[in-house]
């Protein structure tokens, strides 16, 4: 699978670090080069095999949304072509899968918005009738649409740790009341506008995660990735049914396989190392990512 990039090696720029999926490099003092690789992380563990084209799909999808939602909140884009900041022999590594962005002070809270009850939100609700301390009506089912989208923040965890759901009061305590409210209100607005658009393309955005930073003037700025198949749960509207887990356009396919796999007769404990993904799972996952891009944006992979 020659078109897959598991890890970049850009030697012409200082490496700042490898995230689960992205590799970050410094461009001067005020910008970053973010390379979206084909790594896949599930249950906060990085798989050993890349998913071909996944990084390019995510990059193109995020760029689509940054453009579409730019009227709501400033974002980290600079418009500088990534090919211009690396050495000629490194251009192939950044083509279609990298962006040059403003360097921001990240806010260490993940801004999660849920329009539907799913995943950890559904588990919380079953146990307590609430999600992140927010009271919900009784009798809701799995995958049910919520009366209004809710803001359910999470504390950003260290690499390999699970992000932890926190209450809104905790966010206010961490970053201040005014900023917390601004972040919540903008996140819900971004989600609503994106969900409305996605509905016209036959896709339900069940939930999504935004990340924000502050620029040098303290202005709240959208960063990282936005409304991609990695940061969101996308469901095809035509097969959606309340009470069942709809098939997602994301790594759910890998997650389901990992839940079912047995190692020496035992379930995988969701800790590294990850079991080796079969070719069929890799190919189906790659196809899901490409399908999400085309269905949602109307664009082919560039």
UniProtKB/Swiss-Prot annotation:
Point out the coiled-coil segments of this chain.
Answer: none
Keywords (alphabetical) are: ATP-binding, Ligase, Nucleotide-binding, Purine biosynthesis
The record, for CDD domains, names: SAICAR_synt_Sc (cd01414)
One Pfam family, short name: SAICAR_synt
PROSITE patterns according to UniProt: SAICAR_SYNTHETASE_1 (PS01057), SAICAR_SYNTHETASE_2 (PS01058)
Q: What class of enzyme is it?
A: ligase
Gene Ontology biological process terms in this record:
'de novo' IMP biosynthetic process
Pathway listed for it is: Purine metabolism; IMP biosynthesis via de novo pathway; 5-amino-1-(5-phospho-D-ribosyl)imidazole-4-carboxamide from 5-amino-1-(5-phospho-D-ribosyl)imidazole-4-carboxylate: step 1/2
Which cysteines pair up through disulfides? They are: none
- Stated EC number for the protein is 6.3.2.6
What this protein catalyses is: 5-amino-1-(5-phospho-D-ribosyl)imidazole-4-carboxylate + L-aspartate + ATP = (2S)-2-[5-amino-1-(5-phospho-beta-D-ribosyl)imidazole-4-carboxamido]succinate + ADP + phosphate + 2 H(+)
> HAMAP family per the record?
SAICAR_synth
* The name this protein goes by in its record: Phosphoribosylaminoimidazole-succinocarboxamide synthase
Q: Which gene encodes it?
A: purC
